[in-house]
UniProtKB/Swiss-Prot annotation:
Organism: Ruegeria pomeroyi (strain ATCC 700808 / DSM 15171 / DSS-3) (Silicibacter pomeroyi)
Recorded name of the encoding gene: trmD
Entry-linked CDD domains: TrmD-like
Protein name, entry field: tRNA (guanine-N(1)-)-methyltransferase
Biological-process GO terms, alphabetical: tRNA N1-guanine methylation
Origin: domain of life: Bacteria
Pfam families per record: tRNA_m1G_MT
Keywords linked to the UniProt accession: Cytoplasm, Methyltransferase, S-adenosyl-L-methionine, Transferase, tRNA processing
Binding site for S-adenosyl-L-methionine: 123, 143-148
One function term, GO molecular function aspect: tRNA (guanine(37)-N1)-methyltransferase activity
Keyword Methyltransferase: yes
């Protein structure tokens, strides 16, 4: 683990990876980076190579039954997980970033933000030995229906989307309440100065100063955009309303 001092009661992300130097990466910039510096959350990395076996610290081996690629070994992963999870509470999920997992969504991020922290396992090669997932009851989570070379980018996406929900990170709680997915709908269009650009004016209602009409317009826009672009979300939203 990286020797970062522990801050009691602060949300933590612990990452098991072959590339600890990839962190914090973009998480060290902008609002998440400032929040990290201010101690609003913490980041720890575990270098999986440290737990490798043999003179060359091997972390993988060939797939049982044959096939292309390499699979991360269960003995290596088990040792890394045990070390990384030391001192964690019962409210601390262990997640493996995997294309076969549950898709990331806002509800997941809101749930993780209410936890004490999260440990993320970043895979490489052909993935991890299935016995590790079974033994530790690891939850699989996916960034989308595509395959990447490793889980590090997906881990950064998950952390970014969760950290911004932590108290004090954004500064304006309304920002998280009004954005896409928070109400089950996609976000309404946004505009700013100048009032007209390339012959395109800002919609009059947004310049009216009438907060009620602005809210109605934004709601209608959110519903229409969701209905057209994400019929799956729209159906879910309609079903929730009917309940």
């Amino acid at each position: 683990m990286t020797p970062t001092p522990e801050l009691h009661g602060v949300w933590q992300a612990r990452i098991i990876t072959l590339f600890p130097q990839a962190f914090p990466g973009v998480l060290g910039e902008s609002l998440t980076g400032k929040a990290l510096q201010d101690g609003l959350w913490q980041l720890h990395t575990t270098d999986l190579r440290r737990f490798g076996v043999g003179k060359h610290r091997n972390v993988d081996d060939t797939p049982a039954g044959g096939g292309a690629g390499m699979v991360l070994r269960p003995d290596v992963l088990g040792a890394a997980i045990e070390a990384t999870m030391q001192g964690t509470s019962s409210n601390w999920p262990l997640i493996y970033l995997s294309p076969r997992g549950r898709p990331m969504d806002q509800a997941l991020m809101q749930s993780l933000a209410r936890c004490d922290g999260v440990t993320l396992l970043c895979g490489r090669f052909e993935g991890v030995d299935e016995r590790v997932l079974e033994h530790y009851g690891i939850q699989e989570v996916s960034l989308g229906d595509f395959v990447m070379t490793g889980g590090e980018i997906a881990a950064q996406a998950l952390i970014d989307a969760t950290v911004r929900l932590l108290p004090g990170v954004l500064g304006n709680q309304a920002s998280t309440e009004e954005e896409s997915f928070s109400s089950g709908l996609l976000e309404h269009p946004q505009y700013t100065r100048p009032a007209e650009w390339m012959g395109r004016p800002i919609p009059e209602v947004l310049m009216s100063g009438h907060h009620g009409k602005v809210a109605e317009w934004r709601r209608a826009q959110s519903e229409e955009i969701t209905r057209r672009r994400r019929p799956d979300l729209w159906q879910r939203h309609q079903a929730t309303k009917d309940d």
